[in-house]
Amino acid sequence: ACNAERSAISTRTLLQLAALSRQHFEAMQERVQGDWDFSTTGKLVLYPTQAGVDAARHQLDVQSKLGSAPQRIVTAAEAVALEPALAAYQPQFAGAVHTPSECAADCYKVSQQLEAWLRQQGVKFVMGTKVQSLRREGGSNGKIVAVQTSQGDITADHFMVALGVDSVALCKPLGVNVPVYPLKGYSLTLDVSQAGNKAPSVSITDSSRKVVFARIGERLRVAGMVELVGHDLSIPKDKIQSLCASTEAVFPGCSDFAEVQPWAGLRPATPTAVPIAEKAGASNRWLNTGHGALGFTLAFGTA
């Protein structure tokens, strides 16, 4: 998964999936007409050294040949012109990659409003129910006939397993190996409604701090870190303090951090970074998992 040839294949696949996902997301927006703090203000990836900028330029050349969205290298001064909230941080980075087409939205609101719309179309959602196992008929490749749940069996013609890292445990008793591992990450959400030009409107990735900042309406979402800790979802205080410190360093004065909404999640990662969207063993069982940190980016392309 890590050699140059395999990496190029994975990059091409991810770029194609991302483009397809964007198309389907835009089509969904036209149909659902929701309000989920959607914005298309672009993204800047900051690099602390000129060597980092040069390496990014090489990667852009590779991605361009594979069909990526338009991107360009900008100087630190040009980055500040695009996002004035970076002015105080300008001495800390040498340049950046600018992707004008990048968008942001509140994934939770998207999910809520898409669910409401689907209910109107006649889709049934079963909430508050624990999925226990998949019941099949015949041998190892036998068809799945039901999902066994805490509320009884649910039968269907086809079954899609889209449980993130929990897809592994559900499929294991059926002899299906799902190569997904949880990579733990943290985020916090801040109210920046009174921040003025101290808070960014452009999405920012600071490659030196390994932290991303996304403006979602009047809030700023700050996320980062990768930990290999199994399925632990605890939120140690020092992790959130670290994200707060990074926020104050990059965007001083954008928040008083009086109300911080912390969160921890498990990114379902595959060895190649490419999600798994395919049949799994039985003719009527499908997998849709392994999106890693690109869940929103790829979701509509793998649905």
Spans of features found by a protein language model:
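Surface-exposed helix-capping loop/turn segments at secondary-structure junctions
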Residues: 27-38, 68, 121-124, 176, ...
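Helical element adjacent to the flavin cofactor pocket in flavoenzyme catalytic cores
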Residues: 54-66, 86-158
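General small-molecule cofactor/ligand-binding pocket signal
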Residues: 72-74, 124-126, 260
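Short beta-strand to alpha-helix junction loop
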Residues: 9-22, 47-55, 96-116, 234-242
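Short, conserved active-site loop motifs that form the nucleotide-linked donor/cofactor pocket
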Residues: 122-124, 220, 285
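A conserved FAD-binding loop/helix module that cradles the flavin
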Residues: 231-237, 286-302
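Dinucleotide-binding Rossmann-like beta1-alpha1 core, especially the glycine-rich loop
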Residues: 1-76
